């Protein structure tokens, strides 16, 4: 009896969550919240394709609040944002860190916004690699490639010199919303929905 009640409660919760996301999609908004993983990326990519199929002219608004996560999953979202014909606006809120910044930068520079109290973190990729020395060496080379690629992307999208980006990301580099605006991660600070472009 208790098991049935638990399953019913879970089903009701999942149904409510599904309704919420359906309503959210109807307003052409996507919420990327939490650690970026393969599963999260798959869900975000699916929403992007659905919204593109409904209209290629009406913009998509993606709200990003993420401590980072899987860089490859972040690139999957990044590439699809660039792939779809629909204009995409990214809005940073809360904490936008690491791979979260990668997703934020997928929008064109004048289509990147930040809420007033958002914070940003850029740094070099992290590794928890363990194993034999040869595997660690291979992994270290791949990490360095990823680091160089991310630094080049940040420099290209912000206009900050590659040397400065490399220096900044050598350690955790924190920015508040105003500093992120000055750095070029975002193009506008906003406080209300009316501040977002409609077309």
From Swiss-Prot:
Subcellular localization(s) per the UniProt record: Cytoplasm
Entry EC number(s): 3.4.21.92
Keywords of this entry: Cytoplasm, Hydrolase, Protease, Serine protease
Active site, per annotation: 98 (nucleophile), 123
Entry's transmembrane regions: none
Name of the top EC class for this enzyme: hydrolase
Pfam families the UniProt entry points to: CLP_protease
InterPro entries: ClpP (IPR001907), ClpP/crotonase-like_dom_sf (IPR029045), ClpP/TepA (IPR023562)
SUPFAM superfamilies: ClpP/crotonase (SSF52096)
An annotated GO BP: protein quality control for misfolded or incompletely synthesized proteins
Source species, domain of life: Bacteria
Recorded GO MF terms: ATP-dependent peptidase activity; ATPase binding; serine-type endopeptidase activity
Catalytic activity: Hydrolysis of proteins to small peptides in the presence of ATP and magnesium. alpha-casein is the usual test substrate. In the absence of ATP, only oligopeptides shorter than five residues are hydrolyzed (such as succinyl-Leu-Tyr-|-NHMec, and Leu-Tyr-Leu-|-Tyr-Trp, in which cleavage of the -Tyr-|-Leu- and -Tyr-|-Trp bonds also occurs)
A GO cellular component annotation in the UniProt record: endopeptidase Clp complex
Subunit structure: Fourteen ClpP subunits assemble into 2 heptameric rings which stack back to back to give a disk-like structure with a central cavity, resembling the structure of eukaryotic proteasomes.
Family: Belongs to the peptidase S14 family.
Role this protein plays: Cleaves peptides in various proteins in a process that requires ATP hydrolysis. Has a chymotrypsin-like activity. Plays a major role in the degradation of misfolded proteins.
Name of the protein this chain belongs to: ATP-dependent Clp protease proteolytic subunit 2
Source species: Treponema pallidum (strain Nichols)
């Amino acid at each position: 009896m208790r098991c049935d009640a638990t399953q019913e409660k879970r089903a009701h919760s999942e149904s409510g969550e599904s309704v919420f996301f359906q309503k959210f999609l109807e307003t052409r908004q996507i919420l990327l919240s939490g650690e970026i993983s393969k599963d999260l990326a798959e869900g975000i990519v699916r929403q992007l394709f659905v919204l593109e199929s409904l209209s290629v002219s009406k913009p998509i608004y993606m709200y990003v609040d993420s401590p980072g996560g899987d860089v490859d999953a972040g690139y999957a979202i990044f590439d699809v944002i660039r792939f779809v014909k629909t204009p995409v606006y990214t809005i940073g809120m809360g904490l936008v860190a690491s791979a979260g910044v990668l997703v934020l930068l997928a929008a064109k520079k004048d289509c990147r916004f930040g809420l007033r109290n958002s914070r940003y973190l850029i740094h070099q990729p992290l590794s928890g690699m363990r194993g034999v020395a040869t595997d660690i060496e291979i992994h270290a080379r791949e990490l360095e490639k990823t680091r160089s690629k991310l630094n080049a992307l940040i420099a290209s999208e912000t206009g900050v010199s590659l040397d400065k980006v490399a220096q900044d990301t050598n350690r955790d580099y924190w920015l508040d919303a105003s500093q992120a605006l000055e750095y070029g991660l975002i193009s506008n600070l906003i406080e209300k929905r009316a501040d977002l472009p409609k077309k």
